[in-house]
């Protein structure tokens, strides 16, 4: 049957975790107050504000309080969909203004070209929004990589630690579990994908990283698909 599609995690796998934590997250925290003030009547932003109030169980929260909640969620690395949507919108402005480029490990830049040439389908699955993933890969160190991807998945597909999220991906891409390889640095994500029947591979870029009973690689150069 063979592998026909590869699903990659982003932070820690295709992208340096430090770029997310030290560049993108602080940028979104700093930009949130002005962004919400200027865009609060935009329908998408308005929906995110309402969803934030609902999740926080603070229906009467004013804009300043909503901003405070969202900034706290960034610091807690909460995977709340309204936060991830707003971060994507904020990062879009940052990329457009040349504030930063999307960090992608060089070995993945080469690998994604190789996989594409092999007619393998390539997807990303991240707690960051689909829009944020597209921005990362379109403004990358290696140029625009988006044309090599067949799709992207985020928290709307499900929690990355839940088996059901990976079942949902399989249903969406219409492949059997053994035709899909999931690559991540996080053991709990690999366990969830494995429970859904997917093939798995752990990316270990740091010697201090927790490892499990999964096939391990330290670079996409080592991932050869027949």
UniProtKB/Swiss-Prot annotation:
Coiled coil: none annotated. Its cofactor is Mg(2+). Bifunctional enzyme that catalyzes the enolization of 2,3-diketo-5-methylthiopentyl-1-phosphate (DK-MTP-1-P) into the intermediate 2-hydroxy-3-keto-5-methylthiopentenyl-1-phosphate (HK-MTPenyl-1-P), which is then dephosphorylated to form the acireductone 1,2-dihydroxy-3-keto-5-methylthiopentene (DHK-MTPene). Its EC number is 3.1.3.77. InterPro entries: Enolase-ppase_E1, HAD-like_sf, HAD-SF_hydro_IA, HAD_sf. It comes from the Bacteria. GO terms for biological process: L-methionine salvage from methylthioadenosine. The keyword Metal-binding applies. GO terms for molecular function: 2,3-diketo-5-methylthiopentyl-1-phosphate enolase activity; 2-hydroxy-3-keto-5-methylthiopentenyl-1-phosphate phosphatase activity; acireductone synthase activity; magnesium ion binding. Keywords: Amino-acid biosynthesis, Hydrolase, Magnesium, Metal-binding, Methionine biosynthesis. Monomer. Belongs to the HAD-like hydrolase superfamily. MasA/MtnC family. This is Enolase-phosphatase E1. Pathway: Amino-acid biosynthesis; L-methionine biosynthesis via salvage pathway; L-methionine from S-methyl-5-thio-alpha-D-ribose 1-phosphate: step 3/6; Amino-acid biosynthesis; L-methionine biosynthesis via salvage pathway; L-methionine from S-methyl-5-thio-alpha-D-ribose 1-phosphate: step 4/6. It catalyses: 5-methylsulfanyl-2,3-dioxopentyl phosphate + H2O = 1,2-dihydroxy-5-(methylsulfanyl)pent-1-en-3-one + phosphate. Binds 1 Mg(2+) ion per subunit.
